Every structure is written in structure tokens, then in C-alpha cells.
């Protein structure tokens, strides 16, 4: 039978499948056509995310049904050098005790007028 897979870009992919095919098989066919690795694919049908071990018939997917393809969000670990750069940019600062302005690490006075260029500075607290 023929089913359609619609991507977020609006492109529609046509696939030839059987009702007994697993979701893993469908993802493999999408990889063959589009080059998207199966671990990055999420298939949605009738508002539900399809699980790899189940078959098309389990979800009552029939001929000419449309599945929606969403890519899995990437994220998580930051490279150590980028982490150090972010920490230097965000955490290695001084804070004005009166107006809470963020200042460079070697500042001796606040740069803001509203606190009268106060010299009451503290080191920014580290993230836990």
C-alpha cells in the first residue's frame, strides 16, 4: 500500500509499505529516500508519536494515510572549550551592590549613573 510522509518543510514523500511493516522499517525507507538517520526521525499520526517496535496496522494506518515527520531536537552536552568561554563571558564578573549592574572582573567602580558610579562591588556568585 502507499502512504505519504509530510515533512515540516511541506515536502511530501510517497512510500510503498505493507500494513505489517514496523515503524523502524518505515524510518529506514525514509532514510533511503531523504538521508535522514532513523534516530533523528519522529513520526506522528493522528496526534500520536509512533513507537519503533510497533507496526502500521497497530496504529490503524491504512492506504494513502499521511504521517508527519518531525526531526528530533539535538542538544545537551556543550564542548568544554565553549563551556569555558561561556563561563568567562557570563560568570567571571563583578556586580554593583546598589544597581546590580554586571561589570568586568577588574572594575573598581560601577559604570552606571543611577548608583552614582558606586565603588561597592562584589564578585558574581558561581552557578551551582
UniProtKB/Swiss-Prot annotation:
Q: Does the keyword Cell inner membrane apply?
A: no
Q: Which GO terms describe its biological process?
A: modification-dependent protein catabolic process; polarity specification of anterior/posterior axis; protein ubiquitination; translation
Keyword annotations of the record: Cytoplasm, Isopeptide bond, Nucleus, Ribonucleoprotein, Ribosomal protein, Ubl conjugation
* Cross-link Glycyl lysine isopeptide (Lys-Gly) (interchain with G-Cter in ubiquitin): where in chain: 48
CDD domains given in the database record: Ubl_ubiquitin (cd01803)
Domain Ubiquitin-like, which positions? 1-76
At what sequence positions does the UniProt record place the cross-link Glycyl lysine isopeptide (Gly-Lys) (interchain with K-? in acceptor proteins)?
A: 76
Show the GO MF annotations. protein tag activity; structural constituent of ribosome; ubiquitin protein ligase binding
Per the record, the domain of life is Eukaryota
| Cellular component terms per the entry's GO annotation | cytoplasm; nucleus; ribonucleoprotein complex; ribosome
The extra comment attached to this record reads: In C.elegans ubiquitin is encoded by 2 different genes. ubq-2 gene codes for a single copy of ubiquitin fused to the ribosomal protein eL40. ubq-1 gene codes for a polyubiquitin precursor with exact head to tail repeats. For a better understanding, features related to ubiquitin are only indicated for the first chain.
Q: Which family does it belong to?
A: In the N-terminal section; belongs to the ubiquitin family. In the C-terminal section; belongs to the eukaryotic ribosomal protein eL40 family.
- Indicate what this protein is called per its UniProt record: Ubiquitin-ribosomal protein eL40 fusion protein
